[in-house]
Amino acid sequence: MELYQKHLKDVYANFNKLAAVHGETTSNSVTFHVFQQLDSTNLTNYQLENVITQVKELDKGPKDYLYWVILGRCSAHLHVKMLDQLLEEAMIMSDNLHYWESIDKNWYSRVLFLIQSFPTRLYHICRNSIKSILQFQNFSNIFAKKNLFPKVSKSDVLLFPRDAFISQASLLSLIRHEYRGNAKRLRQLRDEHACKIGCLTRAIMSEGVSDAASSSGDKNGISAKADLKQVVSQWIQRLSQLQGQKIDNSESLPDILSITLDNLSHPTDEYFEAKAYFRPSAIERNWPKIFVTLLSAWLSTQIITKNRTSIRLWIDYLYSTAVDFYTNWIQKPILGIFDTIRSNRADSQITLLQTKSLESDMESLQRMVIDFVSDTSPAGINLDLVKQEVQQGDLTYVLQAYEHDLKTPIRTAVSGNLVRTLLIQLQKTKVDVEVALSGIDRLLKSQELVFATVGITPSLIFCYVIIRYVKANIFNNDTLSRAERRQRFRQSLRAAERILVRSQKMNSLDDMSYGLLVFQVNLMAIMSMDMGLSKDVAEDLLQDLEDIQSSSYGVQAQLRAVDRIYRLFKNSI
């Protein structure tokens, strides 16, 4: 997301205002037809080229007010396209600069870089040595350090004696000189791009067109047209100066626009120069991995050939283990969750009691108590009331008889009801246990979905960790992780704050500092797209980033915007 897009639309609106003020928008005119093609703020190069070609035809006739508005809008489009190109190239330079700076963090990275670049260095040694022998018949430069380290300057090489060439210290020192030199030159080229970025962004956000639009209503047609012509000429000349064009006096403004658009289809000269200082190619960086992989494959082939039977059994065992894991711990639990959702609780697989067990035992207890009361109590007792009391757990009649029989336990055990009352209480105990189990059973059935979900959670977590590891380390080597994006965001925010702090005394930014600030802000906007922010938080963050980029209110306001990001988004970045 380009944070300057809104300001660009304001520029277009001011050009439209200039056109509307003088009423030169006749629908039948060819000029107005060309003007209508510039309504979009996102034209392709092909569309813009067609418009410029038509403007060249208009340049041969009388130049009315709308003609200069068309030129202004074309130049504004080219400002955007040039700014996009410079930001993209600066981003690539910054990525390569970050690579060289990461090598300087530890000795392991330097040694690894030396190993990765060894084939290229060997190629330079062979080529330069053969050239030296064939042309000069000089054998003394075969092992010269300049052949092994072609990017290190001569003064750096002379700092080390020849007999220390093969020592580890001198090699690491030369490596350090090389990658620091690459980083230094990339930083210089990026700063040159930053100057152009600052100039373009300041022009897009300037009020020059707005002032011309506001003053055109107070002037006559000739004076207002002269003001607009001056603004448009400045915009077009700025494009040619930033591209380093050599303009002939015979070339018209549409010709300059055409040349500018044609140059935008090719990388800039600074980018071509920066390619010599880019990080090594993917093949050069990964050839140790490829070599180790091929060697491992060859050794594995030898081992497989010698131990074919045992390896086959091992593979079969791993395959069956993976299949069983998927079937028993992923597929079946997931299907069980769906069955739990669709099934009735009465059909639940989690149960402690059979469905009719408690009911039958309760009915048996009621019959035993009613029979006992009928046999031992006088007539006239309400048996339905006794049945209800038994269902509620009240065995008063049985317990009274039991207490009476305990007075003469031996006699009542032989000829009384002691044994009968004991058996009734035993049945009561069984019913009480089943009632408790029934309560636990209902609780388990109510939480069956929770148990099923908890049961499958470890398997899903295990699969998620494996898939994420494979995705992060095998398939997405060139994609920044979320943690890396947040780190790059914090680094860019720190760099933006340093730029503003250094310019705090002057309360303004020069073109290079402002361009670096714009670059860092756009980098933060790109990094924030995949940091896991919600839509509302992302919109608020982009507004604050736009406040950092805007220089309308001074450096202090920009620093407050940086502090606001630190304060409000510290948990998100």
From Swiss-Prot:
It is a multi-pass membrane protein. The keyword Protein transport does not apply. Keywords: Membrane, Mitochondrion, Transmembrane, Transmembrane helix. It comes from the Eukaryota. The chain crosses the membrane at residues 447-467, 513-533. The keyword Kinase does not apply. Involved in the mitochondrial expression of subunits 6 and 8 of the F0-F1 ATP synthase. This is Nuclear control of ATPase protein 2. It comes from Schizosaccharomyces pombe (strain 972 / ATCC 24843). The lineage of its organism: Eukaryota, Fungi, Dikarya, Ascomycota, Taphrinomycotina.
